[in-house]
UniProtKB/Swiss-Prot annotation:
Its cofactor is Zn(2+). This is Probable inorganic carbon transporter subunit DabA. Zn(2+) binds at residues 279, 281, 461, 476. Belongs to the inorganic carbon transporter (TC 9.A.2) DabA family. It is found in: Cell inner membrane. Its main location: membrane. One of its GO terms (molecular function) is zinc ion binding. GO terms for cellular component: plasma membrane. Forms a complex with DabB. Keywords: Cell inner membrane, Cell membrane, Membrane, Metal-binding, Transport, Zinc. The keyword Cytoplasm does not apply. It holds the Pfam family DabA.
Amino acid sequence: MSSHITLIKTNTNNENQMTQFNYKVDNDVMIIRAMVNNVAKQITPVWPLEKFIACNSLHGFESMSFEEAVIQNQTAKKGTPFNEKLERVNWHMIKWCGSFLDIGQGTLEMPHRDKGLYFGFLKLAPFDSELHQNNKSTKSWLSNLPEMPEQAIRLCLNKLGVLNQKQEKFLKSTLSHLPGWAGYIKWISEWKNRNGKEENPVSLADFLAVRLIITCVLWPEASQEEKKKKKDNAYTKQLIQNIKNKEDDYRQLLLNKLLPELDKVQIKENRANAQMVFCIDVRSEPFRRCIEKLGHYETLGFAGFFGLPVSIKDYDGETIKDSCPVLLKPRFNIHEKAIAANEHCIEHHEKGKEFKNILNRIYQQLKYNFSTPFALVESLGIWCGITMFLKSCSPIFARRLTKDLNEMICPSIQTQPVFELDLLEKEVGISLQEQIAYAEMALRLMGLTDNFAKLVIFCGHGSSTQNNPYASALDCGACGGNQGGKNAQLLASILNKIIVRRALAENGINIPQDTLFYGAQHDTTTDEVEIYHSNVSQFIHQDILDQLRTDLNIAKHNNNLERINYLNSIDCAEKDIARRSTDWSETRPEWGLARNAAFIVAPRQLTKNINLEGRCFLHSYDWSQDKDGALLETILTAPMVVAQWINTQYLFSTIDNVAYGSGSKITHNVAGKIGVMQGNASDLMHGLPLQSVMSHDDKSFHEPQRLLTLVYAPREIISELVEKHDVLKTLFFNEWVHLVAIDPRSHLFYKLEKTNTWSVIQ
């Protein structure tokens, strides 16, 4: 079914001359595209391992209430009955997806990848004897498929006998069989490929077309066997009620802790020796408590990308990483350069790096070649055996030995960001006006506009683990699953510029001349904090800096003692935590963001004297400096949304680790360097591993509950912002997030109900 459209173009130079264009529009293609777009809305994007981002497993159902979405998806139900034909279809689909989406793990590359998944399948399927079983009619049918995936979808729906009114539902069911692979393809088409450029283009239409073709061949009666699945609503409703009970208990406990602290919020403190700005990550909270107890230090909370939407090219790396939230698109390209302290050291580093790259290329070529792997094993076997023995029996020693050898070959050097706008290559760097604008916005958002300390440390965070496909899940989510130290160093460098400070002073932010900014990084696995070299001066306030480094080591020890209680270790705290960061057999190097429960937007004075047990995201905020609510608007629509993604991923990975988690790490296989499978052919697992949320097989460590957001600000400001943004109305009124306002004047707690009314919490 098609239509003709005639377009007439008038020549502006001569109105009597017209050019006529005839276009043929295939209505079926448009209808199928519309259906695919509709069913795609309920698929959650799945990020690759290298930038593993937390996301709500039921993101596509947020238009429903939380309870309706959970019941509809039957989170707690048993698996569907085994269907051999369905499993065969899945197996073939996994084979094609794995081959097409592979990013360097496979020895041979799938032909025609640059033309798309469907095109490649179209050309290769007639040669797949496992699919057509050398049946002549099937092989002929595969050889004469239409060129467009939408046309193939229509052909298959008709061949399978799916009624028109049931086609969209059937497509939803088709996608639901492998939501992990479908979610990864959705990420490629909607998140990775925002600028329209992709080497190997793929879409959910491609995925559905290939899947339906395989279904026609292997499971032609699929539409007749698609039955309404029996729902265990009683079990699910009881599960939801248990979650609600935990939420009520935790909310009351937290509010009781906060109540005595409300009178302390307006107390102004004297100038601190040092201020440390940490990421809002829940793992920062216990460390902040530890360092605040050791001296005249003040800590603040801010999103760990420090307000800078940048892409960063590492000094030693060839890849460029987007170091900002996935909700944002990087605006600036930054690279690093070595600090020219020792030219001989830099030269040694460059030669060593080249030597290591050559060795790595040779090793990779030998390892993935058809004929050389056995020879490689024979020649390197004894050395690999020794390495395996050391890494297994003494991981700390093995790590230290590896580090020393690397230092001998390629000594580490200090680097600094290069961020000044390149007049010859304007795509690199940040203009002065934008440096000033982003620096001002960052300071205002973190509530640091006066009373600056002598030292201000912006502290990003990352983790250190071995043999861990989910390493990026432990790094900074606000930096797109990367480590945040470079963003911290970049903001510090900008704020150390005199011209930037003068411009900020004109806008009401007066930074004292004796204030120095430093970048740093907090290792959340070991609690080590590295303060980066400053290019301004290494002698000003050296006594304060030395004392701070000493106190940071003490804080590390104290926080290790607190954390070890949750890790069920009988060893010395620091020794065991150091081992976890270096042991390649360790399935739980740290707990990550497990037990996260609340997002608190308030001055630090409100929470400073409370042990929040590492369960709260803490964002600094002073409502008295934000009369129009613009800063709060940014906080609620960006970092709070990211916190909700994290919270729901942990929630669903806990209550159903099979459906929404990724199962045990013990049986993980990395697939194509993009994700993990259970065994050698499964769906692409898209949640957190069992070891990230469960202390034992049958006992959860994470407490599944929805995010509780507490905002220290007048209700009228909050209400205006909620009414202004659909995302906030969706999250609050559909009860994906609970919102409590703390009135700064009356000190009363108010809960926002799903009816858009406020009720006092007694």
